[in-house]
Amino acid sequence: MSKYTPSLKKHYAEVVVPELRKSRGYKNDHQIPKIVKVVLNTGIDSEADKNAIADVQRDMNAIAGQKTVLAKSKKAIANFKLRKGQIVGCHVTLRGDNMWEFLYRLIAVALPTIRDFRGIATKLDGQGNYNLGIADHTIFPEISLEGVKKHIGLDLTIVTSAETDDEGRELLRLLGMPFRRSSETPKPATAA
């Protein structure tokens, strides 16, 4: 009986690693950048009731494929009407096969369903990691539109072992991340 291997993980081992080794001239396998983890995060309205919190957590569990952790405020901030210990969001860290399956669903299914999608920004954080904001969680196939009471946004962080942005960008590009071409960069609005 053979062990199941996610298709994107197989693609990484069979296509991406040899391509990176050839293009970058890595001599050691440990030099080749890899995806370490994927972190999903969302905020919850501080005045949300328990049912709304449960709905957000249910949707995040479905998207991630594993249980999320509720984030609580560490201190009270009167201007934001925030009490210490109040639930302010939830997050989940994906590693291993869950991470590879999620990335495959993100790249192949979720991102292409965005209306007028022209690719995602190519900017990384300076250390080879990629951050992506998703405005509406209903782009994921695990979420049925009938059960959604409120649309939520997600923050997505892909942490890589790449030492530079160029290495991280090349790794993600070879994995199939649909980056925007440099000629399609949106122009800043000008004052009229």
Where are the language model's segments positioned?
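Ribosome-associated RNA-binding proteins
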Residues: 1-192
